[in-house]
Amino acid sequence: MTLPDFRLIRLLPLASLVLTACTLPGHEGPGKSPDSPQWRQHQQEVRHLNQYQTRGAFAYISDDQKVYARFFWQQTGQDRYRLLLTNPLGSTELELNAQPGNVQLVDNKGQRYTADDAEEMIGKLTGMPIPLNSLRQWILGLPGDATDYKLDDQYRLSEVNYRQDGKNWKVVYGGYDSKTQPAMPANMELSDGSQRIKLKMDNWIVK
């Protein structure tokens, strides 16, 4: 099916709320070495998670468009996950269901699309070049394929720099939710030039 010129609703009334909620505080204390055993242990604990879910605020900001929404992210197994974006009234703007070899997306008109690559599909449908394949690792506080990254004073990821498809993504973590074990990111910002993606996680459920 030919992909339309689809755009999420610009939820501008949420702008101040989301931008305030996603403001990243400065890091305190010196960073730790990526070779430290504490960091290796933290990575191992996160990678052992089979199922998890989180919800919160999403913002995409560029010179061409601004998108604000609520999001729900759920992983039910290896390479099986669901991403939901909703407006303030709770109506679905986008629902993505992915499993190995098959990705399905439903837009706010109920139109269904299928593809092999979730990242490419979202980019074409929404105009937002979200690095979804890498974000699946970054949202957990893991560097993924990136080798240029820094840790905070608690041996957790604080910054990632990664070049992908001609884009230079910088990921900055503003804090972690220590109520979960292991601690999971509480908010983060991705940037590439004038593009910014902000995520604020309200809570995590991990298994």
Curated annotation (Swiss-Prot):
Q: Where in the cell is it found?
A: Cell outer membrane
Signal sequence span is 1-21
Q: Which domain of life is it from?
A: Bacteria
Keyword Membrane assigned to the entry: answer is: yes
- GO cellular component terms given for this protein: cell outer membrane
Which SUPFAM superfamilies does this entry report, sorted A to Z?
Prokaryotic lipoproteins and lipoprotein localization factors
Q: Lipid anchor (N-palmitoyl cysteine) at which residues?
A: C22
Per the record, membrane topology reads:
Lipid-anchor
- Annotated keywords: Cell outer membrane, Chaperone, Lipoprotein, Membrane, Palmitate, Protein transport, Signal, Transport
Give yes or no: UniProt keyword Transport.
Answer: yes
User: Pfam family example for this protein?
Assistant: LolB
Biological process annotations from GO: lipoprotein localization to outer membrane; protein transport
Q: Where is the lipid attached (S-diacylglycerol cysteine)?
A: C22
Membrane-traversing stretches: none
**The protein's role, per its UniProt record:** Plays a critical role in the incorporation of lipoproteins in the outer membrane after they are released by the LolA protein.
Q: Subunit composition?
A: Monomer.
Family, according to the entry, reads as follows: Belongs to the LolB family.
Tell me what this protein is called.
Outer-membrane lipoprotein LolB
Q: Look up and give the organism this protein is from.
A: Salmonella schwarzengrund (strain CVM19633)
